[in-house]
Amino acid sequence: MQQDSHTHGIDMSALGRNKQGLQLAEETVAIEVPGLSLFYGDKQALFDVSMNIPKQRVTAFIGPSGCGKSTLLRTFNRMNDLVDGCRVEGAINLYGNNIYRKGEDVAELRRRVGMVFQKPNPFPKTIYENVVYGLRIQGINKKRVLDEAVEWALKGAALWDEVKDRLHESALGLSGGQQQRLVIARTIAVEPEVLLLDEPCSALDPISTLKVEELIYELKSKYTIVIVTHNMQQAARVSDYTAFMYLGKLVEFGDTDTLFTNPAKKQTEDYITGRYG
């Protein structure tokens, strides 16, 4: 089902920059989903989804609005627990341990699996206090330890040089793109293993989006990253693997280059060529 790259508006030069020869079956698995269904009351939102998220790669979820991609993302750190009437059937194994097992420490899970949302949500505190927020919750208050964590996390989020002289000013004075990178710094300060990014660039301008995309590329050397995006160009640029979802079902999952240039399923081809969605 080979496609002319121009037919679906995806810049094929974006593909292949860091993804040569990737084989999903050969990857170390970070998150295993062996048949997951999810319900909101009587309404089923996910239907028997099975997939393996590879360690220290970027996996993108794409699909039309309402297809279940954000719902699936939020199962990875149990954010859906906060929704009344939400029920999960099946398991999600984080490095072999079922995060839905009885007695799971959900607060610790959310430290290990951090999340960044569509709209930057810095706290109405200083830049410094935003970054150390999670550390203080853990009881870490030594100034030297916090100072080092702030510098390390802000450098990791490619923000240090822009804010190092204003750490004790309000985070609300930062631009939208800076705020989103600050939120990423706050998330990585507690040293998670996985980063979940739910359309992290949808509220940002193109230049800020580019900075966040470059940051994602850098962060995958330390973290497993899963990103939900409506922007197929973005999925092509930043991800190693892509999952296409439709109406709560996983239609196709594979390396990004192949999925965009030679999809196995007609439904995937129709979506990326703009026939629907």
Curated annotation (Swiss-Prot):
InterPro entries from the UniProt entry: AAA+_ATPase (IPR003593), ABC_transporter-like_ATP-bd (IPR003439), ABC_transporter-like_CS (IPR017871), P-loop_NTPase (IPR027417), PstB-like (IPR005670)
Start and end residues of each ABC transporter domain: 31-272
Top enzyme class: translocase
EC number(s) stated in the UniProt entry for this protein: 7.3.2.1
Subcellular location: Cell inner membrane
PANTHER family recorded: ABC TRANSPORTER I FAMILY MEMBER 17, IRON EXPORT ATP-BINDING PROTEIN FETA-RELATED
Quaternary organization: The complex is composed of two ATP-binding proteins (PstB), two transmembrane proteins (PstC and PstA) and a solute-binding protein (PstS).
Stated role: Part of the ABC transporter complex PstSACB involved in phosphate import. Responsible for energy coupling to the transport system.
Protein name, per record: Phosphate import ATP-binding protein PstB
Organism the protein comes from: Pseudomonas putida
Lineage of origin: Bacteria, Pseudomonadati, Pseudomonadota, Gammaproteobacteria, Pseudomonadales
